[in-house]
From Swiss-Prot:
Record key words, sorted: Cell inner membrane, Cell membrane, Membrane, NAD, Quinone, Translocase, Transmembrane, Transmembrane helix, Transport, Ubiquinone
Job of this protein: NDH-1 shuttles electrons from NADH, via FMN and iron-sulfur (Fe-S) centers, to quinones in the respiratory chain. The immediate electron acceptor for the enzyme in this species is believed to be ubiquinone. Couples the redox reaction to proton translocation (for every two electrons transferred, four hydrogen ions are translocated across the cytoplasmic membrane), and thus conserves the redox energy in a proton gradient.
Catalytic activity entry: a quinone + NADH + 5 H(+)(in) = a quinol + NAD(+) + 4 H(+)(out)
Enzyme Commission number(s) of this protein: 7.1.1.-
Organism field: Coxiella burnetii (strain RSA 493 / Nine Mile phase I)
Gene that this polypeptide is encoded by: nuoA
Protein's UniProt name: NADH-quinone oxidoreductase subunit A
GO MF entry, a single one: NADH dehydrogenase (ubiquinone) activity
Gene Ontology terms: cellular component: NADH dehydrogenase complex; plasma membrane
Length: 120
């Protein structure tokens, strides 16, 4: 039987961490100076005046490629521990990972067919 009392210190640690983070953000927001001027709002470029506007919009395809990379990078992060314990988890663990990989392959094929990976 799982005893949940063993997890109480972790819960206390997470609660205190959340409290300190919120307290620090709140104090910075309340007590921080709010005097923006032209120099503070301008981009810094090695001590020189900016040659062009530094706040150029990025193409949405960059974000799409980044999101796809994160998704498939997490896949490999799950594959390494699975490969280490495969002998101990048996056939159920094997087929569970095969279902996981099948879902990812279907998602990859969907993105490929939609043209998300083509760069024009």
């Amino acid at each position: 039987m799982l005893v949940l009392a063993n997890y109480f210190p972790i819960l206390v640690f997470l609660g205190i961490s959340l409290f300190i983070a919120v307290l620090a953000l709140t104090m910075g927001w309340f007590f921080g100076p709010r005097r923006p001027d032209k120099a503070k709002l301008s981009p810094y470029e090695c001590g020189f005046e900016a040659f062009q506007d530094a706040r150029l919009p990025f193409d949405v395809r960059f974000y799409l490629v980044a999101i796809l990379f994160i998704i498939f990078d997490l896949e490999t992060a799950f594959l390494f521990p699975w490969a280490v314990v495969l002998r101990h988890i048996g056939w159920f663990g094997f087929w569970a990972m095969m279902v996981f990989l099948a879902i990812l392959v279907v998602g990859f094929i969907y993105e490929w067919k939609r043209g998300a990976l083509e760069w024009e």
